């Protein structure tokens, strides 16, 4: 459950952090009931006054993106990978890499690619919901687009962490948003306190109690570590880590992340031998 306060305070926080203006544009394409859409697409739009465009359908998404020409665009690694795959269908990776190394052609090629994607007006590009490969961040940087990775969950309105321009460190999800505090428990769990933290789970006081520590910090269930300037690195889920037959602990996410770099792989699940796993 969220209140008006847990919606509005994060809205003001991200507006201040990103310097969002009333001439900014954004494309809404998630279900309107999604917590991120409620925060960014609804409350933050009303608070900041920027333009919000709506995608007509999945089939028209690319045209909708070109119609909106967003200045703010946040998506998931899977979509950023699809954009890259679409570019590679028209221009092989080796050829693109050669063209980007030619000073006279570099700017022209970058502009052409971003315009075709509908991303040529972007001044803030973000990625979240899953780890994004460092190689993909570097690829977009080569096009002049700095992808800022973020981190959050429904329980804190997705208002948790965001990389800062010029301070992106591959493998890290950035620093806390304004007024968000972070700590690592003795068990290695990331715990958070901030204005977006939920009131609790609807009609489920037992689960609500489990979600918070005795002193009021939100338990994320994620393992992590913090560097010297406060950037958070997620090292896996507390419950997903498994042990091999040789006694070695394995965290699946980094392995899955590497597999997804392959152009022919869309989804990847890593599990231990003999473990139950769902496959589609």
Features from the language model and the residues they span:
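Short hydrophobic/charged patches on amphipathic alpha-helices used for structural packing
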Residues: 62, 111-114, 209, 256
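Acidic-histidine catalytic/liganding microenvironments
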Residues: 4, 17, 215, 262-263
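C-terminal boundary motif of the adenylate-forming
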Residues: 223, 262-279
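Gly/Ser/Thr-rich phosphate-binding loop
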Residues: 71-74, 83-168, 181, 266
């Amino acid at each position: 459950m969220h209140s008006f306060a847990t919606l509005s305070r994060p809205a003001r926080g991200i507006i201040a952090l990103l310097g969002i203006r009333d001439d900014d544009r954004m494309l809404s394409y998630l279900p309107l009931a999604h917590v991120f859409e409620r925060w960014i697409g609804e409350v933050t739009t009303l608070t900041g006054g920027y333009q919000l465009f709506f995608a007509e359908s999945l089939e028209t998404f690319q045209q909708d993106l070109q119609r909106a020409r967003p200045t703010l665009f946040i998506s998931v690694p899977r979509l950023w990978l699809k954009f890259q795959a679409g570019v590679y269908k028209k221009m092989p990776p080796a050829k693109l890499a050669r063209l980007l190394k030619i000073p006279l052609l570099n700017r022209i090629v970058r502009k052409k690619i971003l315009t075709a994607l509908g991303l040529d007006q972007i001044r803030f590009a973000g990625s979240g919901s899953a780890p994004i490969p460092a190689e993909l961040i570097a690829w977009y940087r080569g096009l002049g687009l700095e992808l800022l990775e973020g981190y959050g969950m429904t329980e804190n309105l997705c208002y948790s962490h965001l990389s800062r321009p010029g301070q992106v460190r591959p493998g890290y999800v950035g620093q806390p948003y304004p007024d968000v505090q972070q700590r690592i428990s003795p068990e290695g769990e990331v715990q958070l306190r901030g204005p977006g933290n939920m009131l609790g789970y609807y009609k489920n006081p037992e689960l609500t109690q489990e979600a918070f520590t005795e002193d009021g910090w939100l338990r994320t269930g994620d393992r992590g570590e913090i560097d010297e300037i406060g950037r958070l690195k997620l090292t896996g889920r507390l419950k997903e880590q498994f042990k091999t037959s040789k006694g070695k602990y394995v965290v699946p996410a980094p392995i899955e992340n590497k597999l997804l770099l392959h152009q022919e792989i869309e989804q990847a699940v890593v599990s231990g031998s003999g473990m139950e796993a769902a496959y589609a």
